[in-house]
Amino acid sequence: MKTGLLLFFLFIITITINAQGVIIGDISVSGNNTTKESFIIRELAFNKGDTLSNTELNEAINNSKQNIVNTSLFNEVNISSNINGSIANISIDVKERWYLWPIPQLTIDERNFNTWLETGDLSRASAGVFLTHNNMRGRGEILKVLFMLGYNQKLGLSYEMPYLNKKKTFGMGFQSIYTLKHEVNAVTEKDKQVFLKTSDHPIQRDWTNAIQFNYRPKLYMHNTLQIRHHLWEFSDTLVDFNPYYSPKSTTELQYFSIYYKLKIDYRDYKPYPLNGFYTDIEALKTGLGILNNDVNIFSLKSTSRKYFNLSNNFYAAVGLIAKLSWGGFQPYVMERGLGYGRDYIRGYEYYVIDGQDYAVIKTNIKYAIIPKKVFKLNWIPTEKFNTIPISIYLNVFGDAGYVNNNQVYDASNKLPNKFQYSGGLGIDLSTYYDSVARIEWAVNAMGESRIYLHFIAPI
């Protein structure tokens, strides 16, 4: 009886201690030689003067650390509290990354690394320089400059300022990119891209300019609005080869588009999440009726991902992607079904599934063979490069999807309008400077089994 009473009183005391409030006092930041202190404080889940219980304080510190890590500006982030009476003073220590990267580029004009491995054709390579600065003026502003020559020629410039106002909720940016191609994906046959090449003149030119507005009223909510101008030029050879490539086989196309994206992001680590969730909604109106053209397409797309910590190094994830389109005919150059970017079914990397509407579900269960470990290379003098995190996961997955295509250009394409699915095993590596590498074995609904390489998180 006495033991029971003692445990009861200890339980009450514990609850009372955790419920007692502390007031956030001074907030200090160290290690930020480049990054402005105000940029770091913007990511905190608490403010000076807030009253929090001990439990709430610990949770807020953990969430704040994740937010700062997810800026991708720091190798390490540590947050500690010093409680003196009812006042909790907060100390934040960061170790900054290297921000300026003049990177030589050798790119292959393929949808993914696996499709290039199928042929190993280096004649489709382009070389150049990609210059990026991820923390201009110490405010998280991003400058990108691209200069490419070779198979495809490309010039690009973009600048993004995440915050312009005192509350750090409103930002702007712009981008401009010019591309000249001698070979393009002109049509799809047997569910694979068919390329058309011209040697004596460019087969396609395109120039896209955009202005962007960002609004972030809350820590985990992002709004993006873009107004874009597009100018395309197609060779006669291209539109003769595929009359559906552009609207009414035109050789010149110019139009405006408007794009909006709402994103809610509670992932613990964006490059390779293990806990939390992510969801977004995208709306794109192509053709605003301002210029004389025949483009009038509206699409809605949504992506949702949920990540779970099951127990003792076991994790699970599920992702759903869905897209709907309206507006009638979609020229081939604008039509995007599955097989592009992150919208694909594992096991179908060598295929594209054309269509106007689609849905994909992806599932994973993984085991941490090597949970996150951080190695210090002491022979490298700077902390910007001597901190190497490594984690390795065994991954079991299953995907399924469906593409609706009511614009059938070629009867040899059998994958649209049919349920597709796959499953497999993989090994994932998450490491240096947010890098991810995956090797997977997958079998699809056609019974094909292959090994694939990827360099982005599976879900």
Indicate residue ranges for each PLM-predicted region.
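C-terminal outer-membrane beta-barrel translocator/porin domains of Gram-negative envelope proteins
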Residues: Y255-T387
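Bacterial Sec-dependent N-terminal signal peptides
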Residues: M1-I23, I459
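Outer-envelope exported proteins of Gram-negative bacteria
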Residues: V94, Q226, A317-I321, N395-F397
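Periplasmic polypeptide-binding modules associated with outer-membrane biogenesis and secretion
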Residues: Q20-N112, F130, K144-Y163, F298-S304, ...
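Outer-membrane beta-barrel transmembrane domain signature
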Residues: A368-V374, I380-G423
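C-terminal beta-signal and terminal closure region of outer-membrane beta-barrel proteins
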Residues: V408-P458
